[in-house]
Amino acid sequence: TEILESSTNIVDLGSLKNPSAETLLAEDFDLVIMSSAIVNQVKLYDTLEQAGVAAVYFDIETFEDYKGMMEILTDITGNKELYQENVGEPESIIAEQVKRADGSNPTILLLRAYSTGVKAKGSDTMTGQMLSQLGCINIADNDQGLLENLGMEAILEADPEYIFVTTMGSSEEAALAMVDELLTSNPAWQGLSAIQKNQYYVLEQELFHNKPNNRWGESYQKLADILYGEK
């Protein structure tokens, strides 16, 4: 927000999912950075190429994805010292946190909540992969039904040792209200091992839903502290 308020060089390209090709071309950018995960951004590639505008596409879901992106961008700018600061330093922290896994392989349920629903997420997601690298077993990885149709019966049967919730959208309160409506208000919820042991955690959106970028090490450390005790 501070950057937006202080900058005089911001161009409104429209919405994230529908950027304006006309505005992009009119601004005569040297380089356009786009998301390969957003269909309408991908569709702009041919238009940009034909106009002679350089474009790079990224899909960032894991730290390794972020690392690869930063390597390319710092190669382009020549500012390799920024690579060490924003990638090398968090990478060292991540390596330290991964070593803390003690072989206990705790079982976990990872939920993503938003104002209209709640879904279980597997180890192929950003936070899911972090938990996997820290030695966790995600109960949704081997239960496709849980991913497709979150239900109390399957959760009770698996009885995970830890439950993690990430929220998306502008209102965490609305997202957590939906968790309560669909899950925590059920009397059976209180019988889960994770609840009995106070091992239910709502994770910060800025570190576990949004991409944490140079704070990725902090994300790993927060999870490791929960799982294996604060250092």
Pin down the residues of each PLM region.
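Solvent-exposed, polar/charged alpha-helical surfaces in well-ordered, non-transmembrane soluble domains
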Residues: 22-26, 46, 50, 64-71, ...
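Alpha-helical, coiled-coil/dimerization segments enriched in small aliphatic residues
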Residues: 1-3, 119-148
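Extracytoplasmic ligand-binding site segments that recognize negatively charged/polar headgroups
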Residues: 40-43, 58-72, 105-126
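Solvent-exposed loop/turn segments at secondary-structure junctions
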Residues: 1, 31-32, 37-40, 61-65, ...
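A short, structured surface patch at a secondary-structure boundary
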Residues: 1-27, 31-38, 139
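Basic- and aromatic-lined ligand-binding clefts that recognize polyanionic substrates
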Residues: 82-134
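Structured C-terminal subdomain patch of bacterial secreted/periplasmic proteins
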Residues: 67-88, 166-231
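Proline-aspartate-enriched helix->loop->beta-strand connector
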Residues: 21-34, 53, 152-165
